[in-house]
């Protein structure tokens, strides 16, 4: 038997993205966004409302970064989602974040979050709240790379959002090799 929840944005896992952009004053701002994902091999889409300071900064600068929220930074990542940059102009610093300018786009990288997509603005629709960015570069700190130079999710420790229970969770163990395990059924 199934339980119906009606039309709700319930999806597992939901990534926790931290979007960051420079303000016109050169001060970085960021926000937590859980409704987003890869749109195609060079684009990412995120749902953010027009009223956010970060949205205004992205529209002004035409660039942004999307960092993966991590278990190590869950408090700071939640803080930037529940605090408005319009009311707390230094919320980036209050979260304990430090910024380094991206080499690829005019946007800040968050030093404390070790993986980010560096994006140029493609479009924004204030009616649907859909922000689309072209992925110019993905950067990852050496601390989360394995011996082959690939991102190790166990070292990154990304968190996901559970919309049903309003909690953050970490990802679990490796289950099988993708595009391989299904061959057992051929």
Give short role names for the model-derived ranges.
Residues 1-186:
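Basic, polyanion-binding surface patches
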